[in-house]
Amino acid sequence: MSKAIVLDSHLKEKGSVELPKRYEGINSHNLYLYVKHYLSSARANTAKSKNRAEVSGGGRKPWAQKGGGRARAGSITSPVFVGGGVSHGATNNRNYNLKINKKQKRLALEYALEEKAQANKLFVVEKIAIKGVVEDNKRKHLTKEANQMFQALEQRDTLFVCMNMDEYTELAFSNLKKCLIIDVSELNAYLLAAFSSVVMEEAAFQHVVQDKTEE
């Protein structure tokens, strides 16, 4: 059974906690479906070309129907003219979103957590809190303290997951390129798969692994 590594206040390993048994044997296809859903939902539908009804001009017939030796033409907005409308071009009314049901979302999240635990990249700490130093009635050195925390983990990049994150902690991690800190309500399978390691507050971890199959 996969286990998450429990860290002490100095980010040193002090034990482990098992993931629920239901996390075993989940099909990886659920994660694939969720990643497709996540990326397609984020796709900006901005591609747009004008058809012959939308381009300007074309109010008169460009030349006489007969006698000129050229092919007949009724409007310069025709797609055969340079500057005319585009046939079968992109439209901005297309919906790229791919549907996925709640069960597949849950299974994708559980599979991603299981993968991190098997790779020994899932860590649990009691609290993630950055307070900094108060100078001149201002909190300073927030990012420095957050970076020290990240460096102590000795990981390539890290996703931090908090339960009820405070503004100072969020601000502290905002300038670190290889870190992202989120509230547990924002956690999803894509973010778990995108980062090489995950650090969760104990309360956030318990919230995520509680049985939601009855919901």
UniProtKB/Swiss-Prot annotation:
It comes from the Bacteria. It holds the Pfam family Ribosomal_L4. GO terms for biological process: translation. SUPFAM superfamilies: Ribosomal protein L4. The keyword Transmembrane helix does not apply. Coiled coil: none annotated. One of its GO terms (cellular component) is ribosome. Residues 56-71 have a biased composition (Gly residues). PANTHER family: 50S RIBOSOMAL PROTEIN L4 (PTHR10746), LARGE RIBOSOMAL SUBUNIT PROTEIN UL4M (PTHR10746:SF6). Part of the 50S ribosomal subunit. This is Large ribosomal subunit protein uL4. It comes from Helicobacter pylori (strain Shi470).
